[in-house]
Amino acid sequence: MAVFTPVSDAEIALWLDQYDVGAVRAFRGIPSGIENSNFFLTTEKDGQTHEYVVTLFERLTFEQLPFYLYLMQHLAQHDISVPAPIPGRDGEILRTLNGKPATIVTRLAGRSNLAPTVSECGIVGDMLARMHLAGRDYPRHQPNLRSLPWWNEVVPDVVPFVHGDTRALLENELAHQQRFFASADYAALPEGPCHCDLFRDNVLFEPAADGQPERLGGFFDFYFAGVDKWLFDVAVTVNDWCIDLATGVLDTERTRAMLHAYHAVRPFTDAETRHWQDMLRAAAYRFWVSRLWDFYLPRDAELLKPHDPTHFERVLRERVGAGALTLDLPQPCN
């Protein structure tokens, strides 16, 4: 999240006349992230305060956005804790603000944990599997817009900025992924709506209280979602939640907790087990490419904080050089 398109207090107040959410009490930009303009909104209605997030979409179009917004609505209706889009007085959940497509959604309770525990990794794995199953009957279809076709388009633009071993890795991994995506095994992998960006800062936990265990507040920021292989979504999540940040090496306990919890809800197929390493590489490559793109070909933004691209270069090198990796799953009982 970030602020590319500013919105004044007067502009948001006028825009909110189209909604029945009450009077504005606080409105501020959210500095984290790199894709859309986001704001926290507090309103008061009938003596009660309500918390929302307002998003202006900088790249996604009116034609693309219904997939994301109605997916969130669909998941919320299937007991997956996600932000719910708020309809206006006319029933619409998407409209224009300062020349950009915009929406307002509920703000989830809780906080992100950037140093997740083994238990939290298990909680996320369980809910990710439930989210995948809940999305099976979602009727809309839109591919992951940051998958291979986008890599093919963007990599030639960033190659001139990198050199030596880094350029070789960028080009060689693209060739590897092109072969993998063209394979019959890849085509057979199960798929459906995926979050595609389930990093630690896109998940909230509500703190434990009165002896109760910590609970999941929810998943948010679905604006990179798309129909993709479920295993890709798992790999993206593991590559962020279950690694040593300094080296990119997978942490055995956290990885096992996430995979076992996921597998208990939606068992992995044999093909998924065989191609775990390929998908870990694909997930690392996707974010390395996007961070190179944002770093070397940046857009203007009031509060933009581009991510360091070398982090996912390090993760990718670790996945490529780790030897054969398969899913570490529970063994069947005899």
UniProtKB/Swiss-Prot annotation:
Pfam families per UniProt: APH (PF01636)
InterPro entries named among the record's database cross-references: Aminoglycoside_PTrfase, Homoserine_kinase_II, Kinase-like_dom_sf, Pseudomonas-type_ThrB
Pathway: Amino-acid biosynthesis; L-threonine biosynthesis; L-threonine from L-aspartate: step 4/5
Reaction(s) this enzyme catalyzes, per UniProt: L-homoserine + ATP = O-phospho-L-homoserine + ADP + H(+)
Keywords: Amino-acid biosynthesis, ATP-binding, Kinase, Nucleotide-binding, Threonine biosynthesis, Transferase
GO terms (BP aspect): threonine biosynthetic process
EC class (word): transferase
Enzyme Commission number(s) from the entry: 2.7.1.39
Gene Ontology molecular function terms on file: ATP binding; homoserine kinase activity
Family: Belongs to the pseudomonas-type ThrB family.
Record-linked PANTHER family: AMINOGLYCOSIDE PHOSPHOTRANSFERASE DOMAIN-CONTAINING PROTEIN (PTHR21064:SF6), AMINOGLYCOSIDE PHOSPHOTRANSFERASE DOMAIN-CONTAINING PROTEIN-RELATED (PTHR21064)
Protein name per the record: Homoserine kinase
Organism: Ralstonia pickettii (strain 12J)
